[in-house]
UniProtKB/Swiss-Prot annotation:
Domain Toprim per the UniProt entry, residue ranges: 81-176
Protein name in UniProt: Recombination protein RecR
Gene Ontology biological process terms in this record: DNA recombination; DNA repair
Keyword Transferase: no
Renumbered zinc finger spans (C4-type): 58-73
A GO term, aspect molecular function: DNA binding
Alphabetical keyword list: DNA damage, DNA recombination, DNA repair, Metal-binding, Zinc, Zinc-finger
Signal sequence coordinates: none
PROSITE patterns according to UniProt: RECR (PS01300), TOPRIM (PS50880)
Function summary: May play a role in DNA repair. It seems to be involved in an RecBC-independent recombinational process of DNA repair. It may act with RecF and RecO.
Organism per entry: Flavobacterium johnsoniae (strain ATCC 17061 / DSM 2064 / JCM 8514 / BCRC 14874 / CCUG 350202 / NBRC 14942 / NCIMB 11054 / UW101)
Length: 206
């Protein structure tokens, strides 16, 4: 792709680094921004800078937050004895949009994947185990994607907390194998949470 301006070329190259954005789409976005008032582009740039510099991760659940503790964990109305274990922040957003879950979350930051070189030590697993050991947790709900990596991660965590006297469940398999939670429709995802099943049944029946 040829550019008549090095500035445009640099902007397109940076924009195309975003997931799902190719060079042609990046060019359309850059040209759109070029047509906008300078202050509008400034607002966008400042918003992105503020997000990158000031965003925090909740010290309790690892969700994104503007403060040390996220709004969900700080909400005394939520059920703090039930923890929904998810892969990343997009899953928190997807589940929250269902309006069916009233507990809190624990964001792992990924899933175990030997192929990609991701092991348990690179995920937020130890802090979850510590929460269970504290004796304040009644139920853990696994809500990872139905993939080999997701199932491996679930089973690894299960082995770490199996001896504790808590309920360990997983969302019902209303979501197709291999699907990510963020792409599930709200009704299906909401039902899968409400109709969650004991985790032991998922591997004893296999």
């Amino acid at each position: 792709m040829e550019f008549s301006s090095k500035l445009i070329e640099k902007a397109v190259n940076e924009m195309s680094q975003l997931p799902g954005i190719g060079k042609r789409t990046a060019l359309r976005l850059v040209l759109h921004l070029l047509k906008q008032p300078k202050e509008q582009t400034g607002f966008l740039s400042q918003a992105l800078l503020n997000m990158r510099e000031d965003i925090k991760f909740c010290e309790n659940c690892h969700n994104i937050s503007d403060t040390k503790v996220c709004e969900i964990c700080a909400n005394s109305v939520r059920n703090h004895q039930t923890i929904c274990v998810v892969e990343d922040i997009r899953d928190v957003m997807a589940i929250e949009n269902t309006g069916q879950y009233k507990g809190i979350y624990h964001v792992l930051g990924g899933k175990i994947s030997p192929i990609e070189g991701v092991g348990p030590s690179q995920l937020n697993i130890s802090s979850l185990v510590e929460k269970v050991k504290s004796g304040k947790v009644v139920e853990i709900i696994f809500a990872l994607s139905s993939t080999m990596e997701g199932d491996t991660t679930n089973f690894y965590i299960y082995k770490q907390i199996a001896e504790s006297e808590i309920i360990i469940s997983t969302i019902a398999r209303g979501i197709s194998v291999g699907d990510e939670l963020e792409y599930a429709d709200e009704i299906t995802l909401g039902r899968s949470i409400l109709h969650r099943v004991p985790f032991e049944k998922t591997f004893k029946n296999n």
